Amino acid sequence: MICTTIQNRTLEEIMNLLESSEPRIQMAEIRLDRCPLSIEEIEYLFSSSDTPLVATCRVVDDGNGTWEEAEEKLTAAVEAGAAFLDLEIEAPKEIGKRLRRACTEYGTTMIRSSHFFAGTPSDDVLRNTVEKCRKFGGEIVKIAAMAKSGEDVARVLALYSSIASTNSAAETQRPVELVAFSMGEIGKVSRLDCLKLGSPFTYAALNENEAAAPGQWCYSEMLTAVYGGRKPLHCNSPLNMPASKSFAQRAIIAAALAEGESRLGGYSPCGDNEAAIEVAKALGAKVLIESEGGSLQVGALRQAQRPTNPVASMVGELCRTTGSATGSTLIIEGIGSSANIPEKINVGESGLLTRLMIPLAAALGNGNQIEIDGIGTLPTRPLKGASEIMAGFGTVLRPLNPAPEVHVPLTVQGPLLPGKTSISGKGGSQLISGLLMALPLLPGDSTLHIHDPKSIPYMFITADVLRRFGIKIGSEMEGGEDFLETQDWSLCTGITFKIKGGQKYSPAAFDIEGDWSAAANFLVAGALFGDVKLTGLDTTSLQADISIMDILMEAGASLSQIDDGPQDGITNDGSSRNEATDAASNKTSDNEDAPEANAPQGHRGLITAQKAPLRAFDTDLNNCPDLFPIVSILAAFCHGRSNIQGFKRLASKESDRGTAILNMLTQMGVSASASGDTLTIDGESVESRLLNGHLLKGGEYTSSHDHRMAMALTVASWCADSPIIIDDTTCVAKSFPAFLDTYAKLKR
């Protein structure tokens, strides 16, 4: 990253520079000691800009102002949202303590800095200064020393080896980052070399006449030196994200089971959604798609004589017919209690749809054998634990092709019996979601206890969709003291669902929210290689993959969101949120009151991700395993060692995704390994890779016919030494047919 120093500018001039300058400023240091800004103007500046800003107010260097005046300005910047605060190590201790507390409270990264304008001190003084800056709150330590010889430069740059050793010894502490370079003409090259050695950013002047210190490069010169001809990703208009297939598939099946007309707005076609429509039609529902071009009845999608990628073909056909890939409304005329499941249903390539339909087939099949089949990679993906779980409800699964684990094609033979049952959630949430949809249809009440739950958010997505269709389900989460204090779902040890029998699905009308799984690829691309703005996303979503926001923030990304406000009557404080939110607060909800047909929606708005200095991170993806491919790419560009838990969850996705990720990273030249449930990745910043010649290796890659792998490879291609050629990109049609066209709007 390149941090441009802005000084001697008014608020209006600074805002114009941040919003309109060409080339675009990546990151800026605002010299509050030199810019004539009032406290109100400081608050406006640091609260309004999406560009990562460093608040700096020098007292030692210039001798202007007092420490008390500097504290007032810096505090205002931090409270307004400054990404970084730079405080000289010479600041009075009490002021340092107060500013450190403010940084912790408001999420600002503290830089403690020391400048040696008279010359470069001894090695001991340099190392002791680094340690002092670290001791007094420096998450980033900045050392700048005037160089009088090449030896001076070498000694300053040697600090990077010293800080690496210190970080390795302090295993329980967050690693401290170092920005160390030499000043003066002799030290000019060190301002570039520091990026090679792991500095999160370097400083540059706005132009050749405004250097803040001797030897400072101008921004345009530094851009060329670091990036060459590579242009950042950028799109002038926000990109609209497709409908969440997690919500859409559940809602389509629920609408088919409701008696009457349901309207699902914001629909966008993809392979899994179209498979759900075909199942809904097989149950007897009538389905129409209403778009700007009018309405049309959805015809059957033939299984015979499909081309190499049947999912891409059928979705492409639908997109051509409707003339729109997003923003349509599904009108589903459900058949309610007269649902008559056919002897054979095809679930496409959808693992979720398979597991939803197994319990529903048992509940609706009147004791008959119902065959469930699929296409693409689905017949190769085992349904681990499904036979044992369903046997507990009196249901028998029989695979048609003998194998150690149950696969489709298979037959399901009921009955599905109500009652009290405890099952393991280690295998995931999808079959549990199917049970939540089927058990309300039975004559008796059921209590379903899930121990060792995984993918918890998806269970509550199901509960949310069911609530919208009039189904009553109570829930209570369990956990130890850590869970009760933090409400961190990864600490939840059990969930109990209480399900009343004899219920009927009621028709509903609501908009399907945008897909955070798809959005994750664009947010990571923006955080790494430029900037991106997205719309159509619910910022209070139950989707597990909204966790990408937390992961990016942990890595240091620059994110902002502007909510359009509550949709369809939801309150600003979220108080009309559903039982899933109650469960997240460790409450029990029996949902005694039937929901309104038009269920309230969440907050929609504009999400922005912009390039920022990134650091290694630790995260647990057990509840959101679909993020693994793109989070792995993120980690490859975050300086340091990242640890990602949940690796064991990847074996039975559209590919053996864990193996596919390791193979991809190894081929790219990224150091990665898996041990137990943890994937470890040694990352290097984009700038370090460019300057050290450590670009990702281009060439021919396989997506393993996995839509999420294809998307991750597409994002990674920006920083490859030659084009990344993906053997199968049509697989993106499974979840986001327009992905490549949408991604192409991010101009380089």
Per-region residue spans from a language model:
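Short, structured segments at the rim of ligand-binding sites
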Residues: 221-304, 309-582, 586-748
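Active-site-proximal loop/turn and secondary-structure-junction residues that shape catalytic pockets
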Residues: 8, 32-36, 59-61, 89-91, ...
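Acidic (Asp/Glu)-rich catalytic clusters
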Residues: 18-22, 39-50, 76-79, 97-106, ...
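Conserved N-terminal beta1-alpha1 strand-loop-helix module at the mouth
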Residues: 1-64
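Short catalytic-loop micro-motif centered on adjacent basic/acidic residues
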Residues: 4, 28-31, 84-87, 140-146, ...
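Short, acidic/polar
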Residues: 8-21, 66-75, 122-130
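Catalytic alpha/beta core domains of metabolic enzymes, predominantly
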Residues: 91-223
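Catalytic beta/alpha-barrel core
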Residues: 5-7, 27-35, 56-58, 66, ...
